[in-house]
Amino acid sequence: MDGSRRVRATSVLPRYSPPCLFTGHLSTKSNAFCTDSSSLRLSTLQLVKNHMAIHYNKILSAKAAVDCSIPVSVNTSIKYADQQRREKLRKELARCEKEFKLSKSAMQTNSKMNSKFFVNSLQKPSGEPQDQDVFIEEMTRYPSFSKSLIPSSEGLHLSLPESSKMLMSGTQKHASTSPSRHSGCGHGCDRRPRSAHQFQVALAKTPSGDLLEKHSDLFSNKQSPFTPRTLKTEAKSFLSQYRYYTPAKRRKDFSDQRMEAETQTELSSFNSELGTAEKTSSKDSEVNINQVPNYTRNGAEDKIAPLPSQGQNLAWDSIQDGILQQSSERASCKLSTEFSPDSKIYSDEEELLYLSFMENVTDEILKLGLFSNRFLERLFERHIKKNKHHLEEGKMRYLLHGLKVDLGCISEEDPAKQKHFRMLNQLHFQKALISRENEFVSDEETVSHHERQQYQEALDMLSAVPKDENKMFSLPGEFLIPAHKVKHSEGVIIQQVNDETDNEASPWNENNPSVSDSVIDQETSVDVIEGDSDFERAETSRELCCLSTSLSPSGPFPSINGGSNHGKELSTLRIMGMSIED
């Protein structure tokens, strides 16, 4: 029994223990709890050792009642294999990040030493000989230089600050004078492997800060303020199709305005241009006499009477009563034409409205304190839009144009454009001045035009002589008026009066069938009567022109071949009526 137990015990001895006897602290002999003398024997110690080994083997070989091992399907699953591979890659990335951080900190600590060493090497005089192989070997001692070599000295491009760039340019000049040094460097560099990276010096990074400080060489004008630019496109928003969407209003582009900063709040920039603008405005303020309307208003009568023709070429000062005066040099911001108090077209109330309009504009400019051209254009357009329903837009624009001249906003570079703008405003304002008068003048002009036309037609009809085309003989003292159709014609009455007649009767015979002229110095009087054009249109035909010729009493004509008309007396001519169709 003991033998079999001993053999069994020896069969389960642990693999990690040597088969030799226990000595030293492993035996129970040196144990403080050993009190029995029998335990000091070697056989007892071996039995205890075997017993404990068997006990631990049983514990390690024990199995759970529930199988918790990994199933076979998991090991054969592709999804599980991909999951394990991703976990492995994640661990590798974490390890690489740790190594990169450590190397980065080491590079930062050594960067200053590297830069100082390289700058000192560049500052050496060109006369001293320097071995390029030794120089490269010294630089490869540092970790920042160990990964980069250069195939030739001509490919050396370093990212240095401006001071280092100046030194680098100096060394390149000295290197060009000594070609032997380049050849030596080329032979020395050819010994290096071709797989090496390009040589670069790792300097300290640019310190964090403003872009203007980092890249100051890329910005030309640092004093100009930052003005964001918006992309102007003709594309329309999709929301414009929505019934409740109100699109943004586009600003009108003025071609003659100058681009200035919105934040300009001082008048110092306008002081230099103010004197020159006054000189140019005084020259442009001269008004051409031909452009001024040749009409004046009478105080007693509400009619327009044209000025005499010889007064058109006179100067402004020669016109009496102060109706029109020559504009002064500072009249660029005022009206170019002035009227006397008795011939004013605009009332005092309207002038007060214009004065209040200019006062509101100037008050808002002074309140905001902005004097840029863009701001002034916006302000003027807003006030014009606000007051255009009860004030003349042309006069408002002319007054605002004068205000811009006073502020010096109009440059002297384009005097032609300035003069053209002033002439347009003057014409617009003059058109507004005579807009009311044209209503009264229009009827009178049409009437006078028709009168002149009908008078000329009557004279043409009187001077017309019957031709052969009529194929008829006219009686003495009778003449025919050809039919003439005139639209909207007036009524004309023509009378032929005999001032002097011959009392003696002229003989009538076959040889001389015509009657001798018994009428001397006949006068023809033409009376022009105004007619109503509307009434003429209503009637389709009307007798407008009547011709009557009266002769003084004369002797009877002698009979022709003893005819019955021997005692007949011709006193008057027949009245011919001519109907003029519309």
Swiss-Prot record:
It is found in: Cytoplasm, Cytoskeleton, Cilium axoneme; Cytoplasm, Cytoskeleton, Cilium basal body; Cytoplasm, Cytoskeleton; Cell projection, Cilium, Photoreceptor outer segment. One of its GO terms (cellular component) is axoneme. Disruption phenotype: Viable and fertile with no gross morphological abnormalities. Knockout mice show severe early-onset retinal defects and progressive photoreceptor cell degeneration. Significant and progressive reduction in response to light, accompanied by progressive thinning of the outer nuclear layer from P15 to 7 months, loss of Spata7-interacting proteins at the distal CC, and destabilization of the photoreceptor distal connecting cilium (CC) microtubule core. The keyword Transmembrane does not apply. InterPro entries: SPATA7. Residues 169-181, 262-274 have a biased composition (Polar residues). Found in a complex with CFAP410, NEK1 and SPATA7. Interacts with NEK1. Interacts with RPGRIP1. Interacts with RPGR. Interacts with NPHP4. Interacts with NPHP1. Interacts with AHI1. This is Spermatogenesis-associated protein 7 homolog. It comes from Mus musculus. The lineage of its organism: Eukaryota, Metazoa, Chordata, Craniata, Vertebrata. The gene is Spata7.
